[in-house]
Amino acid sequence: MRRILVVDDDLHTRLAIRTWLKRCGFRVAIADGGPNGLAALDDATFDLMIVDIFMPNMRGFESIRIFHQRAPTVPLIAISGYAFSGPETENLACLKMALSLGATRCLRKPFRPATLLSVIDECLSEAEPHRRYTATLAAVATALSEQPGAAAPSDISMERIATG
C-alpha cells in the first residue's frame, strides 16, 4: 500500500485529501504545516508528498525546496490556491518556479478528487522505475554483505553492479 504525506495548514483541505486518498487505498499521513511535515519525513518513508506552497513558518516556494531536499527521490505535488490564481503569465512563472525547486506536478486549489488521483497516478508511475532500481540495489547489497568474509560493497561498486 502506497504511503502519501499531505502537508497543508488548512484543516479542511488536509481532511478532504486524506478521506479521498484513504478511500482509494492509500495510507495517508497528514501534517498541519512545514515543521510537522518535516518531522513526519524523519519518522517514516513516503511514496509521494502533497505540499501546500504557502504555509505559516515557511516562506512560500521555499517549502517546495526544503521538502524536496529532505526527500529528493519522492515525487512532490505542490498545491496552492494563491500561487496559481493570477493572470496566465503569472501562473506560468509560478509553475516554472515550483518545478525548478523540486515539484513534480502542481495543482491549483480547489481541485477535484479525480484530478488529484490522476496526478498522483502519473507521479507514482513515473517514479516506479527508480523505486525498483533502489530496491534492487538494497537487495544486492544485503545479499553481498551476508556472504562469509565479504566486505560491505561501496555505493560505486553497487552502481556498477546495477547498471552492468
Task: Give the residues covered by each predicted segment.
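Two-component/phosphorelay signaling modules centered on CheY-like receiver
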Residues: L11-A29, L101
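Active-site beta3 strand of CheY-like receiver
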Residues: A44-I50
